[in-house]
């Protein structure tokens, strides 16, 4: 039944991944050892999308955990859901990539990649009808960015017709981990543009803002941030894991969301936002969800869609929701804010419904938007990249691993192209093409 194989690479990827598995295990009624003790048949119906059934009523995630150093893996293994994963699926090196993209992509990571692909192959063979892969990683580091993109391109070679979704944590302007983030991110985007089918952009700063502003947490931990990300990941995949009236899968999402193959970088949001351990003290309605979902403060990437326009967007509602309410609200949003949607894609808002809400909520909604404003994110990284690359700062770390300066130049221009493509479609109107032909016609007569 349409399985998904999940990979998590690097420290960030493994921590987000661990939060995700903890989240969906709970939704499917699995305890921390993967034993089912749920209450509803619906939890079992499509368990096989993410879990293999082992002996003794135990379910094992189809997850491959990858890192170039053992530290994070040990933390996951010692964590509350560490016993869930298949021990053979932990693949790790000893040396670490040291936040160096070249180490992850060309040297250290390349040595480990065949081992990882063996595990991926084994997981894929255990599938009935594999739908695709999802990978969680960050773009600012060495392993998640360098080795993550290497894995994506290798998997692409071997499974060219399967979907490839990535949950990518983009370096944020204020919360910076290392000085070479702009290099790593630009080199990664260069890969993602070519090899991923859908990339959900998440950014730590936006997550911090949500924690401080909406959830009123004075000092958010990474645990809180990962909790938010796992809510979105669970929402995006909810249609695959539970029956619903209007189901969508990774491929349907891509068909509806990606008007031009290179423009597959999405902004995500989730509503209602509740802080961990404190469930909302009031009922949530569809209009309220819709309003919160389209609120720029709710986006998990630091770019404001009001500076651009939506090409397409998709809303996934969960819980006991009337189809009509949802349709009305969505139409309402489009009519009131028509200037924020490009007019040359009619019906560019897609909705999906699933009857099972997340734990502890009556209803929830997940938002996925393909907005031209995402270019702000790439612009920001691009400016930082240029500032350093102009001086050739820190380049020796990369050339020392066998990279060429040419690769940096290519990655930079590819990212700049991406930005200008977004800009071009933001400015495009409905009848521009016709005008062009009218202007060209008289020229031929003069000749």
Curated annotation (Swiss-Prot):
Coiled coil: none
SUPFAM superfamilies in UniProt: Tubulin C-terminal domain-like (SSF55307), Tubulin nucleotide-binding domain-like (SSF52490)
Residues at which Mg(2+) binds: 69
Binding site for GTP: 11, 69, 138, 142-144, 204, 226
GO BP term, pick one: response to antibiotic
Subunit text: Dimer of alpha and beta chains. A typical microtubule is a hollow water-filled tube with an outer diameter of 25 nm and an inner diameter of 15 nM. Alpha-beta heterodimers associate head-to-tail to form protofilaments running lengthwise along the microtubule wall with the beta-tubulin subunit facing the microtubule plus end conferring a structural polarity. Microtubules usually have 13 protofilaments but different protofilament numbers can be found in some organisms and specialized cells.
Record-given protein name: Tubulin beta-2 chain
Lineage per the UniProt record: Eukaryota, Fungi, Dikarya, Ascomycota, Pezizomycotina
Gene: TUB2
């Amino acid at each position: 039944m349409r399985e998904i194989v999940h990979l998590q690479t690097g420290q960030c990827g493994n921590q987000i991944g661990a939060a995700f598995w903890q989240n969906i295990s709970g939704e499917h009624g699995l305890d921390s050892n993967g034993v089912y003790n749920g209450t509803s048949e619906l939890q079992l119906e499509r368990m096989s999308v993410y879990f293999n059934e082992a002996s003794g009523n135990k379910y094992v995630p189809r997850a491959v955990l990858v890192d170039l150093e053992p530290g994070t893996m040990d933390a996951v293994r010692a964590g509350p859901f560490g016993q869930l994963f298949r021990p053979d699926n932990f693949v790790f090196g000893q040396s670490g990539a040291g936040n160096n993209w070249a180490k992850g992509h060309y040297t250290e990571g390349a040595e480990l990649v065949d081992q990882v692909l063996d595990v991926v192959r084994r997981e894929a063979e255990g599938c009935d009808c594999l739908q695709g892969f999802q990978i969680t990683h960050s773009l600012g580091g060495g392993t998640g960015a360098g080795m993550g993109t290497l894995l994506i391109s290798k998997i692409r070679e071997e499974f060219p017709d399967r979907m490839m979704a990535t949950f990518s944590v983009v370096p944020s302007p204020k919360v910076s981990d290392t000085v070479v983030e702009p290099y790593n991110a630009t080199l990664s985007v260069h890969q993602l543009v070519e090899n991923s089918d859908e990339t959900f952009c998440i950014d730590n700063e936006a997550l911090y803002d949500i924690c401080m502003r909406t959830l009123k947490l004075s000092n958010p931990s990474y645990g809180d941030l990962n909790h938010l990300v796992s809510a979105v990941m669970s929402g995006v995949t909810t249609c695959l894991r539970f029956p619903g009236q209007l189901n969508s899968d990774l491929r349907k999402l891509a068909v509806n969301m990606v008007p031009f193959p290179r423009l597959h970088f999405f902004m995500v949001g989730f509503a209602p936002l509740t802080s961990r351990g404190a469930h909302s003290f009031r009922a949530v309605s569809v209009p309220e969800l819709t309003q919160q979902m389209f609120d720029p403060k709710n986006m998990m990437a630091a770019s404001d869609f009001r500076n651009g326009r939506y090409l397409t967007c998709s809303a996934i509602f969960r819980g006991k929701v009337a189809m009509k309410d949802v349709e009305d609200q969505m139409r309402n949003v489009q009519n009131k804010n028509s200037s924020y949607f490009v007019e040359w894609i009619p019906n560019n808002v897609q909705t999906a419904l699933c009857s099972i809400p997340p734990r502890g909520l009556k209803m929830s909604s997940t938002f996925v938007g393909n907005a031209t404003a995402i270019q702000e994110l790439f612009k920001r990284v691009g400016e930082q990249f240029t500032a350093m690359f102009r001086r050739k700062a820190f380049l020796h770390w990369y050339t020392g691993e066998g990279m060429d300066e040419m690769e940096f130049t290519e990655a930079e221009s590819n990212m700049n192209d991406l930005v200008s493509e977004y800009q071009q479609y933001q400015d495009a109107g409905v009848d521009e093409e016709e005008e062009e032909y009218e202007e060209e016609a008289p020229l031929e007569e003069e000749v």
